[in-house]
A protein has these predicted regions:
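Acidic, metal/ion-coordinating pockets
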Residues: 1-205
Length: 205
């Protein structure tokens, strides 16, 4: 229900990624309702038709969001043709990260990917993480497996370093398995020092 947006407000959530496999479970009207509810609440989102740019103390951070698939196959028809589905496609990821780099100091990418209930990072996650690093993303925040996965630094083709959280696990869930009730919060600093810009990871306990 749309009233659940109040939970996000109570938790001081300022931004969310809406690209996930439930993105169009309730069709176009559900997607539109989600977007409108977030906008009315003043909560920014990515994973829709554009990259969200957040600015703090003169530093600009771009947020992008993608999902591996949606649960409902939906074919656009006039007059609704052109509705954007944020599926992970190599060309789209490359293009949007490149555009984001022109607009912002840092690029943070949400990836809804991986194998449910598996602590093991799969080959496709690693491939996509490498692609994002090569294109200049600074951080990946992964979701979907519902369990915790590893964190690592990935070096891009230009020598840049990208911090990748493959899966944060669950922060709130009705799943009963103990592994599904463990999650963590990604904590890192985006640092600007003169002409230098870099990411500093914080310990995750």
């Amino acid at each position: 229900p749309t009233s659940f947006v109040n939970i996000l407000l109570a938790a001081s959530v300022e931004h969310t990624n809406i690209a996930n496999n439930h993105y169009i479970d309730y069709g176009v009207s559900g997607r539109r309702s989600t977007r409108d509810t977030l906008q009315r609440a003043g909560i920014a989102y990515s994973g829709y038709t554009y990259t969200h740019i957040f600015e703090k103390d003169g530093v600009k951070i771009a947020f992008l969001g993608y999902t591996y698939a949606t649960n409902v196959y939906w074919k656009t028809k006039a007059p609704r043709a052109g509705v954007y589905l944020p599926i992970i496609e190599d060309a789209t990821v490359r293009r949007q990260i490149a555009n984001a780099r022109k607009l912002a100091d840092f690029v943070v990418v949400s990836m809804h990917w991986g194998t449910e209930d598996s602590h093991t990072v799969n080959d496709e996650q690693r491939r996509l993480a490498r692609l994002a690093a090569d294109e200049g993303a600074d951080v990946i925040i992964g979701t979907h497996p519902h369990v915790v996965q590893s964190v690592e630094w990935i070096e891009g083709k230009n020598g840049n370093k990208m911090l990748c959280y493959y899966s944060l696990g669950n922060s709130l869930s009705n799943q009963e398995n103990i592994d599904n009730n463990i999650g963590y919060i990604a904590c890192f600093d985006l640092v600007t020092d003169g002409n230098k810009k870099y990411v500093e990871a914080k310990p995750v306990v």
